[in-house]
Amino acid sequence: MKLLKRLVSVFAIVLAVGSNAFAGDEVRIVIDEGVDGARPIAVVPFVGSAPEDISKIVADDLRNSGKFNPIAVSQMPQRPTSAAEVNPEAWSNIGIDAIVIGQVVPSGNGYSITYQLIDTVGASGTPGTVLMQNSYTVTNKWLRYGAHTVSDEVFEKLTAIRGAFRTRIAYVVQKNGGSQPYEVRVADYDGYNQFIVNRSAQPIMSPAWSPDGQRLAYVSFENKKSQLVVQDLNFGARKVVASFQGHNGAPAFSPDGSRLAFASSRDGVLNIYVMGANGGTPTQLTSGAGNNTEPAWSPDGNSILFTSDRSGSPQVYRMDASGGSATVVGGRGSAQISADGKTLVMINGNNNVVKQDLTTGVSEVLSTSFLGESPSLSPNGIMIIYSSTQGLGKVLQLVSADGRFKASLPGSDGQVKFPAWSPYLTK
């Protein structure tokens, strides 16, 4: 039996910070557009009962990636409880080449989760072959995490891409009233298990994760001026790392976590600077006319993307991380490069989320929601979260990188904006 103590350690850090600041009104996924055309798969209801529906969580995760289209339970030709009970032909006849079965049973002060991934068409040799199996013991609090672990393993086995269902998102909520209406929150990628990291009477903006997932940098106006704050998620300790005259904003950790790129108008014009992650004397990278903001590092740390209106309207530019000349990339702003360096996501002139292949230069519009902002990629590049305007407020939106699946994560207690997807939080 495999215990998830090591795997949940980083998640426990966030829970420790938020243990006295639970946010009851969570953001939850509401499907806007399904995954027709994705690979059909079956996640058979797990045997046994628990406070969380493990098989539904697994099916939802696979669906959210845009790579899979889990069939409804009512469409399943059988509901096997073991590999021996699986009739491969019954599944292959309806176009299903892999199924997930499992069970969840009480174990001590928690539950044991066991699953098997089964090949129904013989792609691995013989129909009915168990492609993968595993079991975990988790406490009640970590049931969803255990389900996300199943999802990650199944996803990676079937796609050869590391799953990102055990990652988290940080975002800002502006509540409807109260003495401290601005909050930085962290939640599972799907909006569950939400906690407040910090709250303030003054605006908070632009949270950014450190590459080890243990710190958040964000913009705070708590002292009546914009400051960059880095908060340790182990202990909750906060440090102001930039409080220069003028505006200080848009922090971004370098890939090795040692530096922060940010925008500041300390000299009268908004420019891109780089300094140590713990503060210090900044180095100015951009200059000249126009405002420069929203820096984002390339995966190798050698270059920085940023938004500038130097040409008269906002566009995304790219320059060496040590400074120098900049070249136009395109789009309107909020650029981010995938971890493999192959894909760029950004906002275009119509305020839509766009994906650009950096090898071919081909672009694809992924969203047509109103006033899209702040797109953030999952660490495997498979999903994108961003904010948009619905009615009179801001909500989070999720879209798969292939555009197949779209969903909203509306907040019930205020406007939700500035999403940032965490790095991988497990080894």
Swiss-Prot record:
Signal sequence bounds: 1-23
Listed GO biological process terms: cell division; protein import
Entry keyword annotation includes Heme: no
A Pfam family hit: PD40
Subcellular location: Periplasm
Assigned GO CC terms: periplasmic space
Record SUPFAM superfamilies: TolB, N-terminal domain, Tricorn protease N-terminal domain
Protein keywords: Cell cycle, Cell division, Periplasm, Signal
Free-text function comment from the UniProt entry: Part of the Tol-Pal system, which plays a role in outer membrane invagination during cell division and is important for maintaining outer membrane integrity.
Family: Belongs to the TolB family.
Subunit structure: The Tol-Pal system is composed of five core proteins: the inner membrane proteins TolA, TolQ and TolR, the periplasmic protein TolB and the outer membrane protein Pal. They form a network linking the inner and outer membranes and the peptidoglycan layer.
Protein's UniProt name: Tol-Pal system protein TolB
Organism for this UniProt entry: Haemophilus influenzae (strain PittEE)
Lineage of the species this protein comes from: Bacteria, Pseudomonadati, Pseudomonadota, Gammaproteobacteria, Pasteurellales
